[in-house]
Amino acid sequence: MLERKSQAAYDFNLYLSVQIVATILSFVLTTWYIICIDKLTFKIAKHALTIKSQSRELLVEKRLSEKLLFQMLPRNIATALKETGEVTAECFQEVTILFSDIVNFTEMGSRSTPMQIIDLLNDLYGLFDDHIEKYDVYKVETIGDAYMVASGVPVLNGNAHASHICNLALDLQQLMKEYRVPGSFQRKEQVKIRIGIHSGPCVAGIVGRKMPRYCLFGDTVNTASRMESTGQGGRIHLSSDTYKLIKQTGIFTTVLRGVVTVKFSLAAVVTVGDSNYARLTG
């Protein structure tokens, strides 16, 4: 009888010990599991915040890249390039191209520091950029003191391209009458520009991969450049082709300059003005 009671007490104590150990083990494992889950949740939340922050930074970088792309290329061309990865070169039957440069720029550069020249070009072309936004034109490029603008490309605008370019040219020449060099210049430099304009066909397309540029090619570009280089300071020099287009509008005053040799050929050229500006003489 005593042996049975002793065995029963032993069994009960063993059962109780097992239950206590199981309870403690369960508590420890549950606590460990909760701690692990909590740490894992914290890591996931932290990772999610990192991803969110990186996504935000990526979005900002994407917008900056798009902004830079739209500054380098016409908007419709940049959009097509972004969507398809390539843009086919196009032929344009008639566009108008403007070239301008600073008269005696080389001489001015010889008596100025490089920083002064950079200040001058940044200041001057910043003003030009503000003015071209008023017209249906596209700034193709600036190389040194040369400034190139086109109208009728890449967006067609009928026969209005010549008028837009001529109005811009008049606006720029009027701007130069009031222009003062930046404060970095110790002496007052008189800055004049000469402008050359020509109308005709051209081919336009994207050139380059790392730094893509929208470039124009053809004799029209070359002739417009010659119009500028054979022009006079403070005047707007345009070819007879452009003259024929703006003559139809009846709003411009032109003066025949005569026959000028342009790229080994003869071309009739005129200077231009309108009723809002002082008449220009040839």
Pin down the residues of each PLM region.
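Catalytic core of nucleotidyl cyclases, primarily class III adenylyl/guanylyl cyclases
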Residues: S100, H131-H164, E178-V221, L245-K247
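Cytosolic regulatory/linker segments at or just downstream of nucleotide-handling modules
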Residues: C202-V203, T230-G282
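Hydrophobic transmembrane alpha-helices
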Residues: M1-L16
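Beta-sheet entry/capping signal
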Residues: I97, Y138, K192-R194, G234-I236, ...
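Catalytic/regulatory signature loops of cyclic-dinucleotide turnover enzymes
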Residues: R180, H198-S199, D219-S240
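Catalytic NTP-binding/metal-coordinating core of nucleotidyl cyclase/transferase enzymes
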Residues: L64-E66, T79-N167
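Regulatory cytosolic signal-relay segments
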Residues: V21-F92, K177, I251, R279
